[in-house]
Amino acid sequence: FENNTLVHKQTVVSTDILPPGERNKGSAAIKISPDGRHLYASNRGSTNNIAIFKIAADGLLSKVGEQATDAHPRDFLIDKSGRWLLVASRDGNSVKVYRVNTHTGLLADAGQSVSLPKPVMLLAY
């Protein structure tokens, strides 16, 4: 957004491998970390992961990695501290917690999850 105008800066691919026939099953949720340093995108279909990007000072993205999730990560939530990311996996019937490395943006499974039928959205109160 520059001078009250939305400006296209870059197109990125959120997953490296998308099997044939899955062209319409890409990212569901796209969110930025509270410190503005990383962008995350959930990839559905057979990829089932969270793509992680670093945001440069000029706003351009560079891919840092991907974190595997349960089936069909429909939504995710980054807590206010930026240290935790929760993923709602619709077809995995779960909400799973990941620890965020605030320097690299990479995620690590925190070993915490809850079973829920078909979760599709997460909100913080």
State where each predicted segment sits:
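Structural signature of WD-repeat beta-propeller blades
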Residues: 28-29, 74, 120
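Short loop/turn segments immediately following beta-strands, especially the blade-tip
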Residues: 1-8, 52-60, 99-106
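Short loop/turn segments immediately following the C-termini of beta-strands
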Residues: 44-45, 90-91, 100
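Short coil/turn segments that connect the beta-strands within blades of beta-propeller domains
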Residues: 35-37, 81-83
